[in-house]
């Protein structure tokens, strides 16, 4: 069983999702600060998730939905580059979360030795 703090972290991610992605989807307002907080929280959550062998579906859904929304919205957004980059970040975060890794586990240009 996962600790309560882990579920509280997922609740916090959901709130940050609404403040960033949800606000962009419903009101067409791009709050870069909210996206930054969401990015930081996802990075922290990935590190915390490495200690557990399971990841709740809700967390996977939040990350995957964010990635898909950003990819589909970037083309029509005023700030295409920012939204597309965030979508790429979330896609990478999704696969790292599913594999039990975080951003520090893989370094570009360096062969991975298992």
Q: What residue spans do the PLM features occupy?
A:
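Short terminal alpha-helical segments
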Residues: 1-39
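Generic structural signal of hydrophobic/aromatic residues within well-ordered alpha-helices
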Residues: 6-13, 20, 59, 66, ...
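Short secondary-structure junctions and interdomain/linker hinges
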Residues: 17-20, 31, 49-52, 97, ...
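Alpha-helical rod/repeat scaffolding segments in eukaryotic adaptors/tethers
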Residues: 21-31, 52, 76, 80-83
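Alpha-helix C-capping/helix-to-loop hinge sites
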Residues: 27, 45-49, 73
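Short, charged early-sequence alpha-helical segments and their helix-coil boundaries
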Residues: 47-63, 80-83
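Amphipathic alpha-helical binding modules
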Residues: 62-114
């Amino acid at each position: 069983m996962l600790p309560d703090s882990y579920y509280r972290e997922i609740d916090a991610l959901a709130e940050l999702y609404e403040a960033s992605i949800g606000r962009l989807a419903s009101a067409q307002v791009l709050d870069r600060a909210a996206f930054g907080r969401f990015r930081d929280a996802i990075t922290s959550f990935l590190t915390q998730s490495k200690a557990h062998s399971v990841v709740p579906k809700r967390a996977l859904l939040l990350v995957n939905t964010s990635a898909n929304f950003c990819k589909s919205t970037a083309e029509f957004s005023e700030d295409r580059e920012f939204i597309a980059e965030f979508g790429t970040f979330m896609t990478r975060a999704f696969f790292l979360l599913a594999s039990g890794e975080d951003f520090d586990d893989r370094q570009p240009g360096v062969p991975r030795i298992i």
